[in-house]
Amino acid sequence: MVKSKLLCKRLNDIQNEITECNTRIKELLGVTAEVFAYPCGQKFVGRDTNTKSYVPLISKMFILGRGWRDEALVDPLFCDLSQVSGIEMDGKSFDEILPLIEEAKKNGQWLILAGHEMGEGGVQTTQLSMLKQLIEYIQNPSNQIWIAPAGTVAEYIEKNRQH
C-alpha cells in the first residue's frame, strides 16, 4: 500500500512540476508550452508491478509528447501524438541522417530529430557541420522537405487525419 501512495505522489509531483514550469515559461517568455520532451525518453514512473505511465498526463497538458533515442519514423496516420518517436542526431553526420530523411520522404512519414547542445564535440552534441549540411539540404526546394516546429506539425496532423 505504501508503494501505491508513493507512486501516486510521484505522478502528482510530475504534474505539479510541469504545471509550475509551464507557468514560469509563460511568465518569463510570454509563450505557452505546447510540446513536451520526455526526459531521457522515460515515459513512466515506479518500478516492477508499480510502474505507471505518465503519457496520459502529457496527453492532457500538451499537443505533443516527444520521445528520445527511438528507432522508428512517425506515421502521421497512426501515431499517438502524446508519445511520438524522437530520433537522436547527437554525434551523427549528415550522411547518417540523410537515409532517415529519404525514408521518411519516400513513405510519407515524419522524422523528428532530437538533440542536445550544439557544437563540434561532446557526447550529447549535435555537430554544427551536420546541421549546416542538413539546413542546406532542407532549404533546397528540389528536395521537397517540409520543416516546421513539432507543435505545428502535430496541429496539422490532428486537423487533417481521420480518427
Regions found by a protein language model. Give the residues of each.
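Catalytic domains of cell-wall/extracellular-matrix polysaccharide-remodeling enzymes
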Residues: V2-L98, M130
